[in-house]
């Protein structure tokens, strides 16, 4: 299903004008959402990774879209992305039945999403474009700062809720995973941005058709397995 969705998006991206078309921003959002879902999935579980990855990927895609066009982050924009991130954190932690921690972490994420950009620590400061992955000390420092902020915020929330060892372990794991995700994304994002802006739209169309075919084959595997099982 994921292959079908991304295949349809890339094909539509080609048909509707590429980087100058209406789907350019949406394509970036999908690219970063998929990347962050996969990164969070390494340690945080499927439901948590899906909720947080989609929300944070959407916010990141919007940040980079504006940065690429030279549009500054307005107060209204920062407020919108802060709400998106905080709601996602609340929902993801709420599912784990730690309700007070969910509200505290959501509030902290909301505040940090508004404060950090004022200190020049935001996804927009990581924006870059190039033909290959890039790594600079600036990326390392920003990823490290955001990881420490995430861990400290989680521990603060755990202390307020009088969390046990399991809760403390969870918030530390989230903070480390978040920092790792920011670090990896900052390395590969120049490559993603360059190809998004410079590849001919026809390449996305070809990729879209390929993903459609892959998605069809994957979904057809259970049917083929059933048919072969019946013929035995």
Feature names for model-found ranges:
Residues 1-14, 28-193, 203-227:
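Alpha-helical transmembrane segments and immediately adjacent membrane-interfacial amphipathic helices
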Residues 231-232:
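Short, strongly hydrophobic alpha-helical membrane anchors
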């Amino acid at each position: 299903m994921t292959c079908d969705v991304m295949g349809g998006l890339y094909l539509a991206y080609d048909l509707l004008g590429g980087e100058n078309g209406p789907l350019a921003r949406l394509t970036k959002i999908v690219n970063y959402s998929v990347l962050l879902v996969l990164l969070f999935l390494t340690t945080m579980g499927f439901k948590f990774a899906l909720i947080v990855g989609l929300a944070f990927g959407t916010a990141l895609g919007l940040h980079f879209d504006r940065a690429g066009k030279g549009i500054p982050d307005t107060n209204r924009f920062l407020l919108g992305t802060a709400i998106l991130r905080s709601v996602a954190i609340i929902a993801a932690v709420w599912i784990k039945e730690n309700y007070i921690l969910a509200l505290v972490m959501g509030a902290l994420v909301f505040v940090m999403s508004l404060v950090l950009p004022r200190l020049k620590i935001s996804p927009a400061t990581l924006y870059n474009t190039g033909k290959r992955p890039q790594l600079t000390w600036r990326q390392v420092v920003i990823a490290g700062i955001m990881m420490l902020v995430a861990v400290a915020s989680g521990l603060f929330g755990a202390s307020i809720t009088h969390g046990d060892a399991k809760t403390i372990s969870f918030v530390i794991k989230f903070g480390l995973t978040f920092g790792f995700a920011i670090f990896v994304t900052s390395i590969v994002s120049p490559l993603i941005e360059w190809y998004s802006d410079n590849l001919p739209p026809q390449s996305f169309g070809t990729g879209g058709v390929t993903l459609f075919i892959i998605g069809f084959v994957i979904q057809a595997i259970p049917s083929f397995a059933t048919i072969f099982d019946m013929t035995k």
